[in-house]
């Protein structure tokens, strides 16, 4: 498919209107798309992303997020190291707040999240609350202006040697709220939240194996292993840890 919103608000509303002509809204549970998608000019690289992975990509590429006031989805573009152009679309807590406001006014039977673990954690500030017009004044949206750094780990590249690039830091967001409709009409990521970001190094070429020998060196077996490696011209390196490195 072509790059585009994960869950456009108007598309959602149209689909709910359509199904509600056949099924009572009281029996409809609306699925919330809490993830993103990274489209590349190289289609083999197209992949789904979590909220935090999308934010990390935007931060790494110094991209500016665009919050579309028509779809309520976010997007940005960047180029990878091979000069492929990527277009990323994803949802966050503001997107899902607006969708849940719609669901509560319809009213639908409820909502479900797709998928747990990929969501913007700020949604838990309001997910289990009544977001109907009669109750919305009681909902404090101030917590949505701060995004806590995540303890999950985002890995970059491949290999067994790890380099920590970033640790969790909180982000700051400015919101614009329509007081009449009680929805979020715009948001600006002033600073991006970060998670643990780890660069992997040492990826082996195709059809190449890396053998590891644990619990050494051993005075009997290590020389035998080295003799076999030498005979077959296999390069080797020692990583000494624990007591053996002292």
Model features per residue range: what roles?
Residues 210-211, 226-246:
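Short, well-structured secondary-structure segments
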Residues 1-6:
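Aromatic- and acid-rich polysaccharide-binding/catalytic face
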Residues 30, 103, 111, 214, ...:
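Conserved, mostly hydrophobic/aromatic
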Residues 99-138:
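C-terminal/domain-terminus segments
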Residues 15-28, 99-109, 232:
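A structural motif corresponding to the C-terminal end of an alpha-helix
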Residues 9-20, 100, 124-128, 226:
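Generic structural signal for well-ordered alpha-helices
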Residues 27-101, 128-135:
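Glycan-binding loop/region signatures in secreted carbohydrate-active enzymes
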Residues 134-211, 218-223, 231:
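N-terminal pre-catalytic segment of deacetylase/amide-hydrolase enzymes
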